[in-house]
Amino acid sequence: MKKTLILLAMVAALMILPFFINHGGEFGGSDGEAESQIQVVAPDYQPWFQPLYEPASGEIESLLFTLQGSLGAAVIFYILGYARGRQRRDDRV
């Protein structure tokens, strides 16, 4: 019980502390950081290809990113659940 409370307190701290650390800081994704670093290192760099689909807004881009992550997590956990169920079935035999 004590271990559970300590873990819950740590999770709560990890969720709350980022709001107070670097308050008012700018959030940027890794794509933007990579693009700025490429401009510093090689200002004449030209991309090899253009995206097949450019989302209409940042919200749609975030939605597609989230859906991609959710689908990947669903596939991974389906495989893990299937393997665990199969192992339990084999243990009964």
Curated annotation (Swiss-Prot):
Entry superkingdom: Bacteria
InterPro entries in alphabetical order: CbiN (IPR003705)
Keyword Hydrolase: no
Location in or out of the cell: Cell inner membrane
Keywords: Cell inner membrane, Cell membrane, Cobalamin biosynthesis, Cobalt, Cobalt transport, Ion transport, Membrane, Transmembrane, Transmembrane helix, Transport
Record's keyword annotation contains Transferase: no
A Gene Ontology biological process term: cobalamin biosynthetic process
Membrane topology: Multi-pass membrane protein
Pathway(s) of this molecule: Cofactor biosynthesis; adenosylcobalamin biosynthesis
Segments crossing the lipid bilayer: 5-25, 63-83
Molecular-function GO terms, alphabetical: cobalt ion transmembrane transporter activity
Cellular component per GO, a single term: plasma membrane
Family indicated by similarity: Belongs to the CbiN family.
Job of this protein: Part of the energy-coupling factor (ECF) transporter complex CbiMNOQ involved in cobalt import.
Complex and partners: Forms an energy-coupling factor (ECF) transporter complex composed of an ATP-binding protein (A component, CbiO), a transmembrane protein (T component, CbiQ) and 2 possible substrate-capture proteins (S components, CbiM and CbiN) of unknown stoichimetry.
PANTHER family: COBALT TRANSPORT PROTEIN CBIN
Protein name: Cobalt transport protein CbiN
Gene: cbiN
